[in-house]
Each structure stands twice: as C-alpha cells, then as structure tokens.
C-alpha cells in the first residue's frame, strides 16, 4: 500500500523543460477576449513564438503583454518545450494578448491533462466575459448622460 501512495504524487509535480513531448499532430485551440480571436497551434520545439509571422517581442513590444502570454507556460514549467504558432485577429493588443493566453492554456491541457488543476487555480482557463457595453440612444456614451439643467 505504501508503494501506491507515492505513485500519484510523482506525475503531479511539474515536469521540467528537459521532458520532450511527442505529438502525432499539432495541438490546435482557440482563445477569445473582447473582440479578439486567436487560433493557436502548439508543436514540440524550443519555445519560439510565431504570431502572424512575427516574433513575440516584435508583435507585443509591451513587456506586460509578453509576461501575460508566457504565464501559462511558466506555471507548468514548459517555457522551452513548445513552439507556438498563432493567427491573431480582431481587437487590440490587450484583447489579443488575453486571447492568446487562453488559447495557450487550453492547448497545454490537451498535451498533459495533469496540468489542469495548476492552470485552473491560476485562472488561465477562465474566458473573461467582459466586453464593451453598447451605446444607448439618448446618451452620449454607454452610460454618460447629457448635462441636465433643472431650469
């Protein structure tokens, strides 16, 4: 009985970057945030990003966005295990970065389902439902009313 107890704990520890993955085909997922839609392809590799034909640093010069995107890979300690090819469309930089993060997290689960609890706890699997509120007629913006004069 003592031998069966440590066995489940061994795979729960995050695998190091030395572990290589053999996939019969690339993992494909979709991430969405605000108006942005990102199609992600995950293949075993060295940690290279190809975003619409450009590198991560070239496409997202903002360091905050770069950290946001790499966060799921850092959480499961697989930064240099995969190459990521993504087609980003719609929205702005912040929405695209959030959509890419969701797509990467979903792909990592398909590769190794044992990483799901760590990614779920970090909040990387939750689709952020916040979107721009629509403008209403009679108002200047979604909620801003024109100035009111009592007399």
From Swiss-Prot:
Domain of life of the organism encoding this protein: Bacteria
Alphabetic keyword roster: Acetylation, Ribonucleoprotein, Ribosomal protein
Positions of region (Disordered): 1-20, 121-151
Gene3D superfamilies in alphabetical order: 3.30.230.10
GO molecular function terms attached to this record: RNA binding; structural constituent of ribosome
Biased composition (Basic and acidic residues): 127-136
Bias type Low complexity, positions: 1-19
Biased composition range(s): Basic residues: 137-151
Pfam short name (any one): Ribosomal_S9
Location of N-acetylthreonine modifications: 2
GO cellular component terms given for this protein: cytoplasm; plasma membrane; small ribosomal subunit
Annotated GO biological process: translation
Family named by the database record: Belongs to the universal ribosomal protein uS9 family.
Listed name of the protein: Small ribosomal subunit protein uS9
Organism ancestry: Bacteria, Bacillati, Actinomycetota, Actinomycetes, Mycobacteriales
Gene name, Swiss-Prot/TrEMBL: rpsI
């Amino acid at each position: 009985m003592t031998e069966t107890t440590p066995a489940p704990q061994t795979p729960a520890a995050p695998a190091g970057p030395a572990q290589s993955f053999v996939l019969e085909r690339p993992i494909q997922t979709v991430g969405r945030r605000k108006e942005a839609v990102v199609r992600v392809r995950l293949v075993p590799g060295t940690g290279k990003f190809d975003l619409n034909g450009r590198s991560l640093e070239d496409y997202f010069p903002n360091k905050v966005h770069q950290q946001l995107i790499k966060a799921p890979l850092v959480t499961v300690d697989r930064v240099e295990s995969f190459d990521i090819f993504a087609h980003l469309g719609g929205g702005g930089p912040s929405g695209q970065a959030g959509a890419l993060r969701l797509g990467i997290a979903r792909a990592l689960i398909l590769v190794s389902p044992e990483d799901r609890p760590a990614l779920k706890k970090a909040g990387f699997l939750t689709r952020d439902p916040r979107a721009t509120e629509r403008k209403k007629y009679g108002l200047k913006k979604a909620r801003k009313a024109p100035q009111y004069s009592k007399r």
